[in-house]
Amino acid sequence: MAPTAPPILDFSPFYGTDGAAKAKLVQQVRESCEYNGFFQITGHRIPRELQVRVMDAAKRFFALPLEEKMAIDKNLNSFNRGYELLRSQMLEVGTAPELKEGLYIGEEIGADHPYYINGRLNSGPNQWPATVPDAQEFRETSMEYYHAVYELAKDVLAVLALTLDVEESFFDPLTEGGVATMRMLHYPSQPKDEDEKLNRGIGAHTDFGCITLLLQDEVDGLQVLDAPSGQWLDVQPVLGAYVVNLGDLMMRMANDRYKSNIHRVINKSGRERYSIPFFFSGNPDHVCKCLPNCCKAGEQPKYPPITVEDMVRGAYKQSYGRAEAYKKELAEKAKAHKIEAASATAMVS
């Protein structure tokens, strides 16, 4: 069978009363999870008008001067909120740090919240840009959208529970008090002749947490690896749809029955690209262990239990550590080159 891009599924039967249509949706999601963990959904409950507003908000933020964006640099705090500069992250070994900038937003966690006090995963107050046009509307739209997608993530997890032949409510302990990160992302256009082996909008990687729900604009660039054929498949934007993919934590809980698949972004369109992924991790203290019907009788799970906090925090450290190591290596090479050049000049004179 020729490889095909992730299927586009009508999610509306989840909300309806047609049992056969709902069973068909569950089977389609199950097949997608077993193949490569990617699918797109339409027929959800997030209004198109809200999607348009939040995408417009993202564009207003990224149009700000760099110094104004850097005023909320996420490196100024320990809870992963705020602005991320271009080339800050490196997910694919052997490439340059990534050609994207972002704004990280999550649930508002005040200084008196136990998550903030105890330094839990990605938990703290949002770092809002002071100079973005219509600043109050920017904040309100961002949080309205965050909460809407959080509810959709819960619905997707309910369908995932049904694919495992357990109750829709199975993942409720994971979603109660769950941590999620919404990123507004901007990919500058890459020159068409730029070395795509080195330059990525986002390098080839798998996501860290449970599930991701991605809102794309009309500019393509997202590619999913079809493992059996080794081909990269374009995930064409579908107006109003969400690209859903499973993360490493879900694959681990599913004992590798379900897949967290490799994907990347290469923006060779000649245009700027914007997207808003929503990364759902879960309650930081939730202990993730082998899910029902994912381990054959008499077999041991492949992985020991792990908390959401430990799994996701470890993955973050790795990807950002690679970028810093790469920059350090470049600086050392530049320094060595200067020393060599100075020595050569001295010998000539």
From Swiss-Prot:
2-oxoglutarate binds at residue 273. Its cofactor is Fe(2+). Residues 178-282 form the Fe2OG dioxygenase domain. Its EC number is 1.14.11.-. Induction: Expression is induced by nicotinate and 6-OH nicotinate, subject to nitrogen metabolite repression mediated by the GATA factor areA, and strictly regulated by the cluster-specific transcription regulator hnxR. GO terms for biological process: small molecule biosynthetic process. Binds 1 Fe(2+) ion per subunit. Belongs to the iron/ascorbate-dependent oxidoreductase family. 2-oxoglutarate-Fe(II) type oxidoreductase, part of the hnx cluster involved in the purine degradation. The nicotinate hydroxylase hnxS accepts nicotinate as a substrate and catalyzes the first step of nicotinate catabolism. The major facilitator-type transporters hxnP and hxnZ are probably involved in the uptake of nicotinate-derived metabolites, and the oxidoreductases hxnT and hxnY in the further metabolism of 6-OH nicotinic acid. This is 2-oxoglutarate-Fe(II) type oxidoreductase hxnY. The lineage of its organism: Eukaryota, Fungi, Dikarya, Ascomycota, Pezizomycotina. The gene is hxnY.
